[in-house]
């Protein structure tokens, strides 16, 4: 019997009538200043979509039969109409998964969430201890996230996720993350560090080493059966047998995934917020559905893609050349190997002088930190301690 998987992949590559995974950043306002923030969040954009405009988008998603939307930011819960929009979405058959640092997940909010259908909550943690996490996310952010997990567990909220960006500093804590998730009845989700947003400045110091990539792969194969990874780690697939890692081994940008930002701009990928990947705007280009179906960028991405320099590699069918955003923001050709290619094929290009594209906009608060990263820490310190007033 022929496996349906290749046919499904072919459909994904040609693009679907609606995205499977739609990320919507409701606001750039944030109470934290994480060093790797992919959207360089901090300050609210004055052109942020209004409540009415957001509801119009939700109406459109309902007509397109979008299953659910990933809501992020920034910190989405600081937007005054956040809960109104969540209620509106679920009432219009659009499920919501939102990512939060936990700042607004009080016992009362947790109780409300536990009584709500079609809402999924994801708490961001980048260290299994305060020492590791707070060096990335800011002083007090670990305790804040754990407090949110405690509140959700006490309220009986089922299915909370702990979302971890894997870095050089926390890859050794994988077992501890799993223990933490078990303690609060949570599912562990791990994602890849991308060199986008503020991550552009710290990627070289924070992305896992080659040995750590192998360590991560081995852990996922042996212990990661119930760990969510999405499409984060298909670049690791050549380390083992085909199919050993769960997840989608293709770039879904503009085919099955995309992003709407706070002002209504639509990008091909949540990790590629740059003019090069801007497909249109929901306000000025006839709505989201028109952008999704008719954008010239999305049409181009849905055409058969050349394997380029990776075509002669025997592992191409496993990794498909890796992550488009990771290549773009490290100044590598889009038809070449991933900067973290486990076969080492990107090393010659990384050794050469490259132009590193800058993010489209920086919403950070205060002056950017540009001094060299201390080698003893292998990272840039957070810009400021946790502050619950983001606006």
From Swiss-Prot:
Record-linked PROSITE patterns: RADICAL_SAM (PS51918)
Matches recorded under Gene3D superfamilies: Aldolase class I (3.20.20.70)
Record carries keyword Iron-sulfur: yes
Protein name, per record: Mycofactocin maturase MftC
Record gene name: mftC
Record keywords, A-Z: 4Fe-4S, Iron, Iron-sulfur, Lyase, Metal-binding, Oxidoreductase, S-adenosyl-L-methionine
Cofactor binding, note field: Binds 3 [4Fe-4S] clusters. One cluster is coordinated with 3 cysteines and an exchangeable S-adenosyl-L-methionine. All three [Fe-S] clusters are required for MftC modification of MftA.
Molecular functions (GO terms): 4 iron, 4 sulfur cluster binding; lyase activity; metal ion binding; oxidoreductase activity
UniProt domain Radical SAM core: residue ranges: 16-232
Reported function: Radical S-adenosylmethionine (SAM) enzyme responsible for the first step of the biosynthesis of the enzyme cofactor mycofactocin (MFT). Catalyzes two reactions at the C-terminus of the mycofactocin precursor (the MftA peptide). The first one is the oxidative decarboxylation of the C-terminal L-tyrosine of MftA, forming an unsaturated tyramine moiety. The second reaction is the cross-linking of the tyramine with the penultimate L-valine residue, forming a five-membered lactam ring. Its activity requires the presence of the MftB chaperone.
Pfam family, one: Radical_SAM
Annotated residues for binding of [4Fe-4S] cluster 3: 310, 313, 319, 341
Reaction(s) catalysed by this chain's protein: [mycofactocin precursor peptide]-C-terminal glycyl-L-valyl-L-tyrosine + S-adenosyl-L-methionine = [mycofactocin precursor peptide]-C-terminal glycyl-N-{[2-(4-hydroxyphenyl)ethenyl]-3-methylbutanamide} + 5'-deoxyadenosine + L-methionine + CO2; [mycofactocin precursor peptide]-C-terminal glycyl-N-{[2-(4-hydroxyphenyl)ethenyl]-3-methylbutanamide} + AH2 + S-adenosyl-L-methionine = [mycofactocin precursor peptide]-C-terminal glycyl-N-{5-[(4-hydroxyphenyl)methyl]-4,4-dimethyl-2-oxopyrrolidin-3-yl}acetamide + 5'-deoxyadenosine + L-methionine + A + H(+)
Family statement: Belongs to the radical SAM superfamily. MftC family.
UniProt binding sites for [4Fe-4S] cluster 2: 251, 258, 269, 323
Compositional bias segments (type: Basic and acidic residues): 350-364
Transport recorded as keyword: no
CDD domains (alphabetical): Radical_SAM (cd01335), SPASM_MftC-like (cd21123)
Record-listed [4Fe-4S] cluster 1 binding positions: 30, 34, 37
GO CC annotations on file: plasma membrane
EC number: 4.1.99.26, 1.3.98.7
Region Disordered, annotated ranges: 340-391
Signal sequence interval, chain numbering: none
């Amino acid at each position: 019997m022929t496996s349906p998987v290749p046919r499904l992949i072919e459909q994904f590559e040609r693009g679907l009538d609606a995205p499977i995974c739609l990320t919507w950043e409701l606001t750039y306002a944030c109470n934290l200043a994480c060093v790797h923030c992919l959207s360089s969040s901090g300050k609210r954009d004055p052109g942020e979509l209004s409540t009415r405009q957001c509801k119009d988008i939700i109406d459109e998603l309902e007509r397109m039969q979008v299953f659910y939307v990933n809501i992020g930011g920034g910190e989405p819960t600081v937007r005054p109409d956040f809960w109104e929009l969540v209620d509106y979405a679920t009432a219009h058959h659009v499920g919501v998964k939102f990512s939060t640092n936990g700042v607004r997940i009080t016992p009362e909010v947790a109780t409300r969430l536990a009584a709500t259908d079609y809402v999924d909550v994801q708490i961001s943690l980048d260290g299994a201890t305060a020492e590791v996490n707070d060096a990335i996310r800011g002083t007090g952010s670990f305790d804040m996230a754990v407090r949110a997990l405690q509140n959700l567990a006490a309220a009986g909220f089922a299915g909370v996720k702990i979302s971890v960006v894997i870095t050089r500093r926390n890859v050794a804590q994988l077992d501890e993350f799993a223990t933490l998730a078990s303690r609060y009845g949570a599912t562990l989700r791990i994602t890849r560090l991308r060199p986008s947003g503020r991550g552009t400045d710290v990627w070289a110091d924070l992305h896992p080493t080659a040995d750590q990539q192998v360590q991560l792969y081995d852990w996922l194969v042996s212990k990661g059966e119930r760990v969510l990874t999405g499409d984060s780690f298909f670049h690791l697939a050549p380390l083992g047998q085909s199919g050993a890692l769960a997840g989608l081994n293709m770039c879904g940008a503009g085919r099955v995934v995309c992003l709407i930002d706070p002002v209504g701009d639509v990008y091909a990928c949540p990790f590629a917020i740059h003019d090069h990947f801007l497909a249109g705007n929901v306000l000025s280009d006839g709505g989201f559905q028109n952008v999704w179906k008719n954008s010239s960028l999305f049409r181009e991405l849905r055409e058969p893609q050349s394997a380029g320099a990776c075509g002669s590699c025997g592992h191409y069918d496993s990794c498909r050349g890796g992550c488009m955003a990771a290549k773009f923001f490290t100044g590598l050709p889009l038809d070449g190997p991933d900067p973290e290619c486990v076969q080492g094929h990107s090393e010659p290009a990384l050794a050469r002088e490259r132009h590193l594209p800058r993010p489209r906009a920086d919403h950070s608060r205060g002056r950017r930190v540009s001094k060299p990263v201390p080698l003893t820490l292998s990272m840039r310190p957070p810009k400021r301690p946790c502050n619950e007033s983001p606006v």
